[in-house]
Amino acid sequence: FCAYESCLPADELAVVISQSGYSTNALHALDTIRAKGRTAIGITSDPGSDFRTHADLLIDYGCGQESVGYVTMGVTALCLFLCLFALRSAHLAGRLSEDGLAAERQKLAQWADAYEQAIPAGEALLRSRYRQLSAMQTVCIAGAGAAWGVAREAALKLMETLQIPACAYELEEFLHGPELHLTPNHTLFFLASDPHDRARGAQLSRAASLVTEKTFFFTDDGGDLPVPSSPDALLTPLLFLPFFQLTAYRLTEDLHRWHKHPLVADFESAVSGKSANYVSKEVL
């Protein structure tokens, strides 16, 4: 952003988000926005962090501080916060009626209930296919639409905890190169909720199962993870996320993988993505 995308049109809203409030790239982005004479808006879960001295307007998005470095609540809370922000902004701009605002907020409330049900569904899938999941070596996760974002978060969580290669792709992107490196040792997840994406995801999952039996298809209409129905297809992919978060924790615990390679400590000492005031919670 600071080097390539910091041209800020007058009608464009720019905000900087950092759950910890100590990420150096986010702090630099706030400084860049302020240097251009614009209001530097920072959104964080820790209003006492370094964000407070770099932001002109500091917003606490309400998830609180997590007790571990491999955060999980923050991403879900942030998605909900941004949805509510968008709805309120649309209402204030006259683009969403009072009734429309109430209806959309009700959808979010229904989604929150569905999220609670998705957690035990994820635990059940982990138990039923524990042998395959505990033997994961290389992981590919492909998703379309909002599910692509979930795929990226899921890959990050598996990689930073289990310390295995995990890549995220857009559903169609997976067909343009990534499929060529598949072997029976791969574990594959295909995420889709929109009806059009669902058909394509099912097709890819069936094809991938010809290479590896460790193939999973997540959707709101059947599939390997029986999540409850969501009131909006844009919200459904977030119901897939608890499975990956729970799996990352449970398998890292069971396989004793919390500690990293000894040389990772040297890397962290040489360069950091956090400011000097940050207290690391990650296990090295």
Question: Where do the language-model regions lie?
Answer:
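Glycine-rich phosphate-binding loops that contact phosphosugars or nucleotide phosphates
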Residues: 1-100, 107, 144, 179, ...
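A residue-level detector for conformationally permissive "hinge/kink" positions
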Residues: 13, 34, 135-137, 169, ...
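Terminal peptide-recognition signature
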Residues: 15, 158, 247
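Residues at alpha-helix termini
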Residues: 35, 160, 210, 253-254
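Active-site phosphate/pyrophosphate-binding segments
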Residues: 59, 65-69, 79-186, 256-284
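C-terminal non-catalytic interaction/assembly regions of soluble proteins
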Residues: 220, 249-250, 270
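Internal helix-turn-beta structural module
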Residues: 229-259
